[in-house]
Amino acid sequence: MYNCPNCAGNLVFDIESQKLKCEYCSTLLDPYEYQKSQDAEESDMFGVTVYTCPQCGGEIMTTNVTAAGFCTYCGASTILDSRMRDEKRPAHIIPFTRTKEDCRKSYSSLVRRALFAPREFRDPEFLDRFRGIYIPYWVYNYDFSGDLHLKGSKTYRRGDYKITDHYSLSGEVDARYHGLTYDASSSFDDTVAAAIAPFEAAKMQPFTPSILCGFYADAPDVGNEVYREPVLNSISQDSIERLSGVPEYRSSGADMPSADEFKNQLRGSSMNLSSEEPVCAYLPVWFLTYRKDDRVAYAVMNGSTGKITADLPVDKKKYILGSILLAVPIFAVLAFLITMTGQMVLTASSVLALVSLVIYGLELSAISDKDSHADDKGFAAAGRSAGSSGSPDAGDKKAEKGVFAAIRNYGKYALLFLVVLLVFPRLGLDYLTGSGNLTGFKIYGAVSVILLFGALVFIWALADSETAKKNMVLQIAGSVIAVGASAAILVWNPVSDLWFYGGSILAAAGVCLSFLGIISKYNILATRPLPTFYDRKGGNDRAK
């Protein structure tokens, strides 16, 4: 507890004044001078209260704040368990300079542009749940100098010949990259950290625990070796971009070499590359959590620069209403400008259904990557698990899945063979008899079946997580029926247009059903699985 020396009231760090402020008598104190008066001796540890969520295991630390009744990471409304602990003192800290009111304004502006965002995202009570957390980051400093030798090239045409000129780009370089930051917490997704980067290294100050007053902090559990390669990649990319602006290089017109080639130069004998041992720093982040069922959405703002990112799912009711309001004028305009036959309408519906299947498949791939934390090095390095089964019969279920997967794969090819036997003989008969009924619409109808098969194989190949597979068959059924029915009618080519218009209505209904499935999958993609921190390892042992 940090108490006011005048009235013994609770002290908090005031963002506007950048000083400690008493909540009762409004006394302002310099955080460094106050800390000196409190510390009997310098120590590389400082005492904190650790609050743990009983549902997900997430931890946040504080020096003097009673935890609110909800978890920052999983959004659960619960009483957090607490205990005292000594934490390793970081080297630096950037105090908050953006207030909670700044968060509300920035987030409200972001949500205002998201027309289909859930109504709760505009609720003032919800916006008041922004929580200030200091996230641990590793700070990297690199210096390099020496002779630079790179290869460039310029390709152009002269008549029928394609000519490539090769250039040797040489020079001397002397550069320093200081204050490069990467998060040291496995609970803070690397993609989110990248979205709010960079922090202003010039604002870093020596750490003192009193600056944490009124805020929370996360514990480091990712070692500094994890991001050494990404740091060099970042330095190489920035260096190449800067070199491309040098007049001597730019005047040649040559294409600059890749960042990988520059990185190889950094590690070569002609370059003196040096780095300091990375140090830990606490950097300010505003955090807002929205939870629905078994998914969470985060809004995160850089507490120093104000840069914000947010997960924004879609409200299905708003989406349906907006789609109807948009579709009516579009349909009216098209009806006046374009005369479409029944075959054209049916073909267009079929194409739209195929496109929806491709979009659906791409979403499945993105969901699998996101839920497995494929782009989060810190998550993997901390020994975290994206999800596992602890049941004793998990191995048997896996083997059972393998058997059914094999049957399903062979079944696809059998189905394709059956379709070829049924559809293409009809087209061949039209061609051999010269009946004149072999039209482009008929050919498309047959080809669309092959495309449908390819789309289904594409979808099944990308659905490699349970979240992605959930309700998948139902969600794609509409488009599958749309393509199948359209193909059958186009190949049959009945005399009456009623078949084409009836098929178009059926196909349109199927596409609408599938688009609802796409929105459902988008909402999964726009949110995150509930975190589990019970397998979280580390603390000061890993983050050393």
Could you say what each language-model-derived stretch is?
Residues 1, 17-19, 46-50, 68:
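Residues immediately within or flanking Cys/His clusters that coordinate Zn2+
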Residues 4-7, 22-25, 53-56, 71-74:
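Short cysteine-rich clusters marking metal-coordination/redox-active sites
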Residues 14-17, 32-35, 63-66, 81-84:
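Short Cys/His-rich "knuckle" micro-motifs
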Residues 26-33, 74-82:
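Short Cys/His-rich micro-motifs in 6-15 aa windows
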Residues 88-291, 317, 329, 338-414, ...:
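Charged, low-complexity helical/coil segments in non-catalytic cytosolic or luminal regions
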Residues 283-317:
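Extended, hydrophilic extramembrane loops/domains of integral membrane proteins
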Residues 323-338, 412-427, 449-455, 477-488, ...:
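Canonical alpha-helical transmembrane segments of integral membrane proteins
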Residues 353-356, 445-456, 481-486, 497-523:
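Alpha-helical membrane-embedded segments
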